[in-house]
């Protein structure tokens, strides 16, 4: 028998341990001890919760808004957290991140994930999306084994409606698969993951980048090196998803020699040579639809309009008959207006929840832009797509730098693209030019097939989403376009380029992705610094939002803010991207300052040596002539690239220029078939080739008094894939020669070229920034010859 411990008191009473514990509990109830509550992890104005999933970029966390009052119900969001140090190591990942951000800004559809805002701190980049509580569609089919025909028909109609809306906006997803689809709480389909999204045009939608996932990618992306129709590739992926809904497994999954599908070459050879088979429980009507969609030949494959008219989708005919522009107008009315508090000039944003967020702006908040809530007001600036555009391999975008320095940039498109030139004066004289463009579009009489305008809300930092507005109405409100202004700083774009060597999982297969082409317009992210006290501070120099300068006299900085001239996702206000402490700024010197130093140096040399010299004129020193052969078919996409130097120079410089001018670059798009036939299916990622440009010819000293002039013709080759076409000059600078660096080519580009910009985000090479930043130092090093001559005569006079 166990004894109970006892303790005698002075009063003679016996108190046991049980009584003592009961007294302690009573004391805790009567006199509670306030312990320190556990602090929640926060990211900007959101409280971070559990992990919803983990993908290629990082973890997706559940978040909810901070309640400002007891009656307020927090709103749940999904925050995709991306470590910034991982972006520095992988340039492809950076492209996909900014592509997704800029594409989601322009999509307002119930079956497409909605972008709330974009946040950033010193460690993470957070993409705040709406929370879809139904889970992944892939796991949903696994639980159900297969879907009933009625349920599959409803979900497939929602998928077709969302994809048709994207195509109407001029965007293609190119990575539709079960893993990129979600379900909401009402089991409605939601399309996500826009990392491979790209822009196309009605007149020419051919693309050359092989991307997507095995089994979901169309055969023309894999077995052929020719350009493919982007919309037909999305149609194929929709057919594979429909087959998986009805059958419970993917089509062409019965190859016994390749059961796992790791051998991509054998898989697509089996797809192209084997007829489609169906399980017995699939009825004839959906079989007919699948036989029309899953056709290896894209010319025989039906389009989305034919799919919507199919008899199997007749129960959802009313839903599919809704025009895409209706979703923009309808969802804009449903969104509550954001509270108009605070200073309008401050580049702050508002949240999309029911709360007013009056306190979040005063906290250490990283709120950047709430693209969800936009109220409809008179547009200030909008652009529309021309009906019959001209083709060009390159286009120019004119920006406004933080130092008001103008630079010029060539954007090599992944495909031939339509473009329209918009030039605006910083004094607000661009109204007449916009009206001329709008009048030119309306005079053609052709109906625009897609909406291409972002309109700016007066008195608000946010922008309204695109909607179908006639050009005549848009020009009525251009007069107020000079009212909106915002502050900006340089945004550090990481240019550490390399191709990932580790083999990714089969569901994220993207071997042909590269980093140039039409993505240079994605550096359009204004920045507000985060002060030392943790509060957001505005930039000092306000710059007009619509101050688009002349392209003849200006050049572009890699870190400036781009204003897209037109296109299906053209916009006047990009995603506001706050800058974090510890980031690097590249203070590029303007090319004009470098040229001024060269002129002073040459003038000084000529005065010392007694030679007549002419100052270097940036417009006459070099002339770039960009020529392009019209691309009417997939085979006519090879353009020769030559460098010619015509002028009076030394024999060495002539020999070097002749040697450089004979190099011809031929680049073909990557083919999965060629890769796996050579590597036996051992790797799923391949390094994209990068063509290295040659340094420009040297303009040497001419003691005979003749002026050095060179006409340089550059014919750029149209890339077969998205590989870089950035020249990388690596030459020694002699004291007797003055080298013309690569950025000087952009200054005298043909002003007659039309302007076009893409919605996609791209990264620029670090070498180009280092060239611009080091030009001033190189010029100072070149002054040694004149200085030596001057010092020589000084010393000689002192001897006497």
UniProtKB/Swiss-Prot annotation:
Q: Residues bearing Phosphoserine?
A: 365, 388, 521, 748
- Coiled-coil stretches noted in the UniProt entry, renumbered to this chain: none
Q: What is this protein called?
A: Serine/threonine-protein kinase KIN4
> Which organism's genome codes for this protein?
Saccharomyces cerevisiae (strain ATCC 204508 / S288c)
Q: Which reaction does it catalyse?
A: L-seryl-[protein] + ATP = O-phospho-L-seryl-[protein] + ADP + H(+); L-threonyl-[protein] + ATP = O-phospho-L-threonyl-[protein] + ADP + H(+)
What does this protein's UniProt record list under function? Answer: This protein is probably a serine/threonine protein kinase.
List its EC numbers.
2.7.11.1
Comp. bias intervals (Basic and acidic residues):
727-740
